[in-house]
Design a protein with these regions (language model features):
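Sec-dependent N-terminal signal peptides
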Residues: 4-13
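Sec/Tat signal peptide C-region and signal peptidase I cleavage site
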Residues: 15-19
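Ligand-binding cleft/hinge of the Venus flytrap
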Residues: 38-44, 118-166, 173-180
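Glutamine-centric residue-chemistry signal
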Residues: 62, 171-174
Length: 183
């Protein structure tokens, strides 16, 4: 994925490369990948990337209001396509990677990972789950997908009062890492 992402940024930034740097609005989920490839991009091109991380929905709003980003790396295609439809983008929206929704658990969690969320449902009933962190479904695509998955598993009503909402995936991850949420 890193090579694909590096190539995507390289070709996307060709129009702004004369400036010596490109300003990138990137979904928080891309922090580790972009932190790794940014120095490689600079070494290969002589140009730097100035990366801001956050939720895709907030970046959409900022760009709509005139924020000077050269590249928008969203966690989904919805927000970039809106910018294209509103004639606020200079290029078509293109997918650059495919993400996966996961249930993040601390190493010593009493919850058991499973693809059906059956243990999460059991944890709701037996009291093992008091706080569940998700990204804000209004502005973060992974938050939206988490809400959809919980609704599909008929767990949304049960987890809703236990939610700890992060502004983006990075913040939701920090809630779990710090112990503020069990999952």
């Amino acid at each position: 994925m890193l090579k694909i992402l590096a190539c995507f940024i390289w070709f996307t930034c060709l129009g702004t490369a004369h400036a010596g740097s490109a300003t990138v609005a990137a979904a928080a989920t891309l922090r580790h990948a972009l932190d790794e490839i940014s120095p490689q991009f600079t070494k290969a091109t002589g140009h730097t990337l100035k990366v801001a991380y956050g939720s895709s929905g907030n970046f959409y709003s900022q760009i709509k209001q005139g924020a000077p980003f050269d590249v928008f790396l969203s966690a989904d295609m919805v927000f970039p396509q809106k910018l294209v439809d509103e004639k606020l983008a200079v290029a078509p929206a293109l997918p650059y990677a495919e993400g996966r929704l996961v249930l993040l658990l601390p190493r010593k969690s009493r919850l058991k990972p499973d693809g059906t969320l059956a243990d999460l449902a059991a944890a709701l009933k037996d009291g093992r789950l008091s706080k569940l962190a998700i990204a804000n479904p209004t502005v973060a695509p992974y938050g939206t997908r988490a809400q959809e998955a919980l609704m599909h598993a008929d767990l949304w009503a049960g987890v809703k009062p236990r939610l700890v909402i992060g502004e983006n995936v990075g913040q939701a991850t920090q809630f779990v890492a710090s112990g503020a949420a069990q999952a």
